[in-house]
């Protein structure tokens, strides 16, 4: 839902094109969500059908995004690197006097990585108000509940203490997403983060949390293709 909103309503990249230096830039720090991005790019005619239908197959789309494919702005690797990348791209745009915003989606499990907090400090110090982070707060990481691995605590207070403007919304509700982006668009001189409370697998009955949590507490659909 968040990626659909960004490409269809929020960003200028579809209008300007991926080679235009004035474009808004989006990428996900948690690259395992690439199929969702591929679906949006396919719907926009950016990824061809023959490639879209070969996810994780030889000659097809990779399980994590790769810049060899049109429309992919950044690769993903070790978790926790996305905000740092976003900081650098935002700084480069300012240095080159180019317009355009930078949007980064992160996972909640990623915030067990310390690099995120280094990036939060740096972005606030530089008042990078064109950097917008969306935290996909679905409370599941890889195959377990986040709070069973490391409880993240009060995220709003943590982000605010680093100097970020923080908003929270239902990340599966387009009207809530619209209101939140409208609000943060007015904020100047501070980077922004949206804590988007989402339900993993929303809308697909057998994938939707908590239906897909097995008896051993493992979430089944972190990767792989549906079997229903």
Where are the model-predicted features located?
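Cofactor-binding active-site loop characterized by glycine-rich and histidine/acidic residues
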Residues: 1-126
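Generic beta-sheet signal
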Residues: 24-26, 100-104, 131, 190-198
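Short acidic, glycine/serine/threonine-rich loops at helix termini
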Residues: 38-40, 115-117, 143-147, 179, ...
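Short secondary-structure boundary/capping segments
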Residues: 44, 148-151, 208-214
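Conserved thiamine diphosphate
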Residues: 97-100, 147-180
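A short alpha/beta connector and helix-capping loop motif
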Residues: 113-138, 193-195
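Active-site pocket-lining segment
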Residues: 131-144, 156-163
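Glycine/aspartate-rich loop-and-adjacent alpha/beta segment that forms the canonical ThDP
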Residues: 174-228
């Amino acid at each position: 839902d968040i990626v659909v909103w960004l490409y269809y309503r929020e960003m200028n990249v579809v209008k300007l094109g991926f080679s235009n230096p004035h474009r808004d830039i989006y990428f996900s720090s948690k690259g395992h969500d690439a199929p969702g991005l591929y679906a949006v790019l396919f719907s926009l005619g950016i990824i061809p059908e023959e490639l879209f239908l070969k996810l994780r197959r030889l000659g097809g789309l990779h399980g994590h995004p790769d810049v060899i494919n049109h429309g992919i702005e950044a690769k993903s690797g070790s978790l926790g690197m996305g905000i740092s990348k976003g900081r650098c791209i935002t700084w480069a745009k300012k240095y080159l006097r180019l317009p355009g915003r930078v949007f980064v989606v992160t996972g909640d499990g990623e915030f067990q990585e310390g690099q995120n907090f280094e990036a939060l400090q740096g972005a606030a110090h530089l008042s990078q108000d064109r950097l917008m982070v969306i935290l996909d707060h679905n409370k599941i990481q890889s195959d377990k509940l986040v709070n069973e691995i490391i409880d993240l605590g009060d995220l709003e207070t943590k982000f605010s203490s680093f100097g970020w403007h923080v908003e929270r919304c239902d990340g599966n509700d387009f009207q809530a997403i619209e209101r939140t982006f409208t609000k943060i668009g007015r904020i100047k001189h501070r980077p922004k983060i949206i804590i988007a409370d989402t339900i993993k697998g929303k809308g697909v009955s057998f994938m939707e949390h908590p239906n897909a949590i097995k008896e051993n507490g493992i979430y089944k659909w972190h990767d792989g293709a549906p079997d229903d």
